[in-house]
Amino acid sequence: MVATLANLNFPYLILSACLSAILLSRFLPFTRRDRRPTAKGCLPEPRVFQWDVFFGLDIPISQGRALQQNRYLEWLRDLHASMPRTKTFSVNFGGYRWIYSIEPEILKAVYATNFQDFGVEPIRQHPPGFKPFAEKGVSTSDGEDWAFSRSLIKPFFERSVYVSTDRVKPFADKFLTFIPEDGETFDIQPLLQRWFLDMTSEFIFGKSQDSMTHPERAEVIWAMADVLRGTRLRAQTYKILWAFNWDWWFKAIEKVHGFLNPYIRSTLAELAERQQRVKEGLPVGEERTDLLWSMATMLPEEEALRSQVCIIFVPNNDTTSIFIAHCLYFLARHPDAWRKLREEVTAVGDAPITFELLRNMKYLNGIMNETHRLIPNNVTQIRSALSDVVLPLGGGPDGKAPLDVRKGDIVSVTKTVMYRDPDRWGADADEYRPERWDGMRGGWHFLPYGGGPRRCPAQMMVQNESGYMLCRLARRYARIEARDKEPYRARMRIGPSSLHGVKIAFYKE
């Protein structure tokens, strides 16, 4: 035995011992949960059978492979299908308890009833899941930091801002000039991304990127896509970040920061100069009204400001454009739905397209809701338990008993499965049918923008912009045809987008 040990490299022994200690520290708390007392009335949740019962590495490896192969949505559906007798279950995820659910009442508890008991910082800041892309921001912070981040942006998502379609109109006018003539096949997804980049860059920075005219200026979109893909993967695997090579993600971050830094630095310099002139009693010009300027007045520090801007600009630059692309993906495959939309739009003639007009278009809103339902942008809602808490459902073999959740546990509500649950939506849950929304009331079973205090502040703005663009297209074109050869496959960023694009053709007659 002594001779054998003597032949081993001592540093490797130390490394092996350290790794074993780390893995055991992850595994032992998970196994000891069954021996700790639980709250009165609570029952343990069902658990998924796993090959790696000790360290729980089979789930993150399987999940990571699904993300790389662009079949993450299918992976989630298969995972839930493997537990047909319950809507809530858990897995050992790298030695940690990860609770999956499609129960609306659990979503309500996490987002509203027990809001203070759940957070995102343990996932996105500790360990550094989103670093060096961003640290503190409205979607990475809890408590006072979150409240401050929300205060930075809240004025720009008030009713007086989101109800205006005047901001959207010139960009939509320009967008329509880039659509090919009748019957020509084109991919509308990247064009929508450039349209939205131009509009959001003016809204946030006060100056449009004008990438519709100059496509080369849209390169930052593809870097942002890689950043979003990486943040999604890191949010899902934040307990085992060490297991992956992140070089590609860091390179994408450098490109995005390189795009944002000139805007931020020039804004801070302009702000300092303006404040100095005011101090000296010198005249100043009209103050800027863009979001970055407003944020800089409250947070005049470059790195902290960049973190806040990254969290707002990068994820949101993908959301609206991809959502509209998904709406058109379905409409191109359902000509009756396009016909009904066009009838609703043409019924108002040439009336100005206002927020109130869009809100009253029932079929248009049914189309948007049905698209949110079938391809939700937020596929999962993930929170970390900040304290011990009892959820109203999830325990027992059928998931109907209360469930004891411990500090550090992860609760993940799978919206892409919940929104197709036949118990809630009927036997046609997988079918595209905008008519189902006629008279349907909302609730915790359908929250495309989240709920509770952390509900997306841009909800009405996204709906207004998306509805406006769909209305303009329906007013202009009599028909839309699908020209995709491939079935839909989701490529994950923060949310899913079509791996093969959205290839369509429009006809005016």
UniProtKB/Swiss-Prot annotation:
EC number: 1.-.-.-
SUPFAM superfamilies: Cytochrome P450
Cofactor: heme
Gene Ontology molecular function: heme binding; iron ion binding; oxidoreductase activity, acting on paired donors, with incorporation or reduction of molecular oxygen, reduced flavin or flavoprotein as one donor, and incorporation of one atom of oxygen
Subcellular location as annotated: Membrane
Role: Cytochrome P450 monooxygenase; part of the gene cluster that mediates the biosynthesis of fumosorinone, a 2-pyridone alkaloid that acts as an inhibitor of protein tyrosine phosphatase 1B which is implicated asa negative regulator of insulin receptor signaling and a potential drug target for the treatment of type II diabetes and other associated metabolic syndromes. The polyketide-amino acid backbone of fumosorinone is first assembled by the PKS-NRPS hybrid fumoS.
Membership in a protein family: Belongs to the cytochrome P450 family.
Full protein name: Cytochrome P450 monooxygenase fumoA
Organism: Cordyceps fumosorosea (strain ARSEF 2679)
Organism lineage string: Eukaryota, Fungi, Dikarya, Ascomycota, Pezizomycotina
